[in-house]
A protein has these predicted regions:
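Interfacial/gating helices of multi-pass transporter permease domains
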Residues: 43-62, 128-132
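Transmembrane alpha-helix boundary and packing residues in multipass membrane permease domains
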Residues: 25, 29, 41, 77, ...
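Helix-loop interface residues and adjacent transmembrane-helix termini in multi-pass membrane transporters
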Residues: 34-37, 45-48, 82-85, 159-160, ...
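Residue-level signal for short hydrophobic patches within transmembrane helices
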Residues: 15-34, 38, 60-67, 142, ...
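Small-residue-rich hydrophobic transmembrane alpha-helices
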Residues: 51-110, 114, 147-166
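Short alpha-helical transmembrane segments in multi-pass integral membrane proteins
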Residues: 1-22, 79-145, 176-179, 191-192
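Alpha-helical transmembrane segments of multi-pass membrane transporters/permeases
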Residues: 156-183
């Protein structure tokens, strides 16, 4: 019995460290979803057609964003492995390559969503909703470039166990999104 408790105590010592690493990652991942949630809440105040339009646009962007984020997940274990082996040259090489790949993937995903926006018309949605969704889809699809490129930095930092930096930048990004939504959606100050 003592042997089992001893092994369990060795195992549980890592819980605190793992949670310290994991909670910023979880909050950061929720931050990506929170942007679309806030957009839905704020645009929903304009009307049902506007809400339907951004929901339709977000369905396209969510698929592309999931591909970009999923693709970038490979960076973290590669960086962590190189960091654990104290191979600084490998860390820089992995980061440089992952940045270029994520930037390229961001461009490809943006173009894929942007060039296929006419698919909105074949989704049996009211024409009013599609006309509202098309310009929204353009602006939101542009964010794919920054999201996927940001992921290369985020996964790099996560691989080095600096998980809080990405969490803080995601929280700041969400705050900026709320402020800009307020001005751009409702047309306050100098915005139409």
């Amino acid at each position: 019995m003592n042997n089992i408790l001893k092994r369990l105590s060795i195992y549980t010592r890592e819980f605190k460290y793992n949670l310290k690493l994991a909670y910023p990652v979880m909050i950061g991942m929720l931050g990506h979803t929170f942007v679309q949630f806030i957009d839905n809440v704020m645009v929903g105040q304009l009307g049902t057609a506007e809400l339907a339009a951004i929901s339709l646009g977000n369905s396209f962007v969510f698929i592309a964003m999931s591909i970009g984020i999923g693709f970038s997940q490979a960076i973290t274990p590669l960086i962590a492995e190189a960091d654990g082996a104290k191979k600084d040259n490998d860390i820089s090489r992995i980061f440089e390559h992952s940045f270029v790949i994520c930037l390229t993937l961001g461009i490809v995903l943006f173009l894929s969503v942007f060039l296929n926006r006419n698919l909105l018309y074949s989704m049996n949605q009211p024409i009013e909703v599609v006309k509202l969704a098309s310009p929204y889809l353009f602006w939101v699809s542009m964010s794919l470039l920054t999201i996927v490129t940001f992921q290369s930095f985020r996964q790099f930092a996560d691989g080095l166990s600096f998980t809080r930096a990405a969490m803080y930048s995601t929280l700041v990004g969400n705050a900026i999104n709320i402020i800009l939504n307020y001005f751009l959606i409702f047309g306050y100050w100098i915005f139409p």
